[in-house]
């Protein structure tokens, strides 16, 4: 797999396959553009076998995904996990709602913050942690149009400064 690396153990004389602890599969880039992200939380996700295989091959899109609370549970909605090509007719539905796994106290805390402060719960990225799929959730406050413009101009000025510094160092 693309995220495994082999670690040689010279004393014992064999190779150990060491899996990377965190492997990011996808990020929700719209979330960084549309929200001020504040606190981060980790949640497990209930997936079918074909879904985890599609995730590992990188066939997932979280562009319009959001988290919906329902009867004391959290559900990931509009996350598109493509059908696994080798599954045949037993494949999963790509746009189905997927249950997020968290402790009840954590869910209650998140829901109280969402109701009280006017924050939104946004899925930021899906990653593998020791071969288990996890979703990083973040509490976010929506940006206004002028906030989005400010972040774009700040990013552009930082890029220009980096280019100038790089150019000056190159000329010496």
UniProtKB/Swiss-Prot annotation:
Gene Ontology biological-process annotations: trans-translation
KW Cytoplasm (keyword) present: yes
Described purpose of this protein according to its UniProt entry: Required for rescue of stalled ribosomes mediated by trans-translation. Binds to transfer-messenger RNA (tmRNA), required for stable association of tmRNA with ribosomes. tmRNA and SmpB together mimic tRNA shape, replacing the anticodon stem-loop with SmpB. tmRNA is encoded by the ssrA gene; the 2 termini fold to resemble tRNA(Ala) and it encodes a 'tag peptide', a short internal open reading frame. During trans-translation Ala-aminoacylated tmRNA acts like a tRNA, entering the A-site of stalled ribosomes, displacing the stalled mRNA.
Disulfide cysteine pairs (residue numbers): none
Protein name: SsrA-binding protein
A Gene Ontology molecular function term of the record: RNA binding
Primary residence: cytoplasm
Protein species of origin: Dehalococcoides mccartyi (strain CBDB1)
Family: Belongs to the SmpB family.
InterPro entries associated with the record: SmpB, SsrA-bd_prot, SsrA-bd_prot_CS
């Amino acid at each position: 797999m693309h995220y495994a690396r082999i670690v040689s153990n010279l004393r014992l004389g064999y190779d150990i396959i060491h899996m990377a602890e965190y492997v990011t599969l996808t990020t929700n880039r719209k979330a960084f553009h549309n929200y001020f992200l504040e606190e981060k939380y980790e949640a497990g996700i209930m997936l079918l076998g074909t879904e985890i295989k599609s995730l590992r091959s990188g066939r997932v899109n979280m562009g319009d995904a959001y988290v919906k609370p329902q009867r004391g549970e959290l559900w990931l909605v509009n996350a598109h996990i493509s059908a696994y090509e080798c599954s045949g007719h037993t494949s999963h539905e790509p746009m189905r709602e997927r249950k997020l796994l968290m402790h009840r106290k954590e869910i209650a805390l998140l829901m109280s913050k969402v109701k009280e402060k006017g924050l939104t719960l946004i899925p930021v990225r899906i990653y593998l942690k020791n071969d288990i799929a996890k979703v990083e959730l973040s509490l976010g406050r929506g940006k206004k149009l002028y906030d989005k413009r400010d972040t774009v101009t700040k990013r552009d000025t930082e890029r220009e400064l980096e280019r100038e510094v790089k150019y000056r160092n190159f000329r010496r």
